[in-house]
């Protein structure tokens, strides 16, 4: 078992938490997976996997399980409210510190520190700052857009019918990464805590505009996929004010924060390319 042997993981039924869980187990870590409903989570029985029933809204439901943990991987969602996300993050940091957790890895979002006015970016910056002030050894990850966002049923169904419909303009350049790579990077950090202590890392493995995304889909799927921009008023109506504000910002600003992507790929070899990812999930 690695030196930081026991890792507490949140969001294990989601993309990032699930990827962290899988990759940590592959490398011999003991994982404590926090879930609200183990029966619904349906996590396979695996050696070194301990499923913990608890709720991030109720620290008393999970704090005793942090006592023997060496590390925490934290990924939170804002979908139940920004204030709730911030409170969950602060409380998990506080309880981790009280239980002498040695290392805290937080998956935030790229651009969280830029005063964009995007609520679910700025909430994560508050959690980042609370982690820094906690005194715990830590690494903060700032992933770019996830490939997995393209698996949202409404998006995927349109792609399968020949249209990539997104709120971004056709020439808006974005950076992307897979959740699986975030899980691999998280595992590398826990294997090498001295190397990554105190670092804040922007993460991306691909950079494309809307038309390039559609062209890559066309190549990987062997059929024509056309890009189409979702009108702003529909974005706001369907996705809400927060995401509409985010896409408006992305459409009007430089959202490419990883300036040396090759250096990142050299640091973390084997990152998944977009075409490779499409072939796995759309064929």
Indicate where each model-derived feature is located.
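Oxidoreductase cofactor-interface core, primarily capturing Rossmann-like NAD(P)-dependent enzymes
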Residues: 2-46, 57-60, 67, 78-84, ...
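Electropositive phosphate-/nucleotide-binding environments in soluble metabolic enzymes
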Residues: 18, 86, 121, 180, ...
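A hydrophobic C-terminal alpha-helical subdomain
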Residues: 232-283
